[in-house]
Amino acid sequence: MGEQLKKQPVLRGGGFTFKQFFVAHDRCAMKVGTDGVLLGAWVPVLHARRVLDIGCGSGLIALMIAQRSLPQVQIDGVELEPAAAQQASSNVELSPWAERIHIHQQDIHQFAENHPHQYDLIVSNPPYFAPAIACRDEARDTARYTGSLTHDALLNCAEKLITEDGMFCVVLPHELGIEFARLAGQQGWFVRCQVDIRDRPGKPLHRMLLTLSRQAGETVYQHLALRQSEGVYSPEFCQLISDFYLNY
């Protein structure tokens, strides 16, 4: 490890300080949260060469993947909301991986139609609320509601952009994850890994991590409790976040 990485991170407001980078999110509708951290820490990066983050928000997941992946891996983040895209670009510029991450302020449908590259890893922390009740904040509405990007459209865009043997990874509320997997199956995707997540043992399942592929293969099913019964982080969750969270 270089001397730069041995220095203690400087704690700042308006965002979240990780061990190797800072994510400002004061201009983003969706803040740094457990869902994004889970996805960024969990996705399989070993064989990735080109990575796409759909709806990248503050750039959190792209930055986490950059930290975990090989130096030659290139990462594109696509974000529709202008303020979030600008903040993601700023976060990237201040990170150790500015040469590897590129933020595009663009609709993913246009990006999918016009972008020449295909990706062997695509990730997304997608919108999941139905648009029956609008948020007061238009940017937050875009970030949280499927009216801006339906799950059907997300799967279609991913199909256009993924390599033949690429992986598409998402995090969703558990019930919606079941529906997303069903919809994906109707569109020719195969579930290759499913992680059912609960806050602690005995509590209801509340999140799901999914890895999809266009290629059939064995499905791996796993379970994760974020905390132990007494409320402290579980060893499994600590292992996921140990390279990112301070004091772990």
UniProtKB/Swiss-Prot annotation:
List GO BP terms, alphabetically.
methylation; tRNA processing
Cross-referenced InterPro entries, in alphabetical order?
Answer: DNA_methylase_N6_adenine_CS, SAM-dependent_MTases_sf, Small_mtfrase_dom, tRNA_Adenine-N(6)_MTase, tRNA_adenine-N6_MeTrfase
| Gene Ontology molecular function | nucleic acid binding; tRNA (adenine-N6)-methyltransferase activity
Organism (species):
Yersinia pestis (strain Pestoides F)
- Coiled-coil segments on the chain, per record: none
Its biological function?
Specifically methylates the adenine in position 37 of tRNA(1)(Val) (anticodon cmo5UAC).
Look at the named UniProt entry and state the broad enzyme category this protein falls under: transferase
Q: Which Pfam families match?
A: MTS
Substrates-to-products reaction catalysed: adenosine(37) in tRNA1(Val) + S-adenosyl-L-methionine = N(6)-methyladenosine(37) in tRNA1(Val) + S-adenosyl-L-homocysteine + H(+)
Protein known as: tRNA1(Val) (adenine(37)-N6)-methyltransferase
Q: Where in the cell is it found?
A: Cytoplasm
Please state the protein's primary subcellular location. cytoplasm
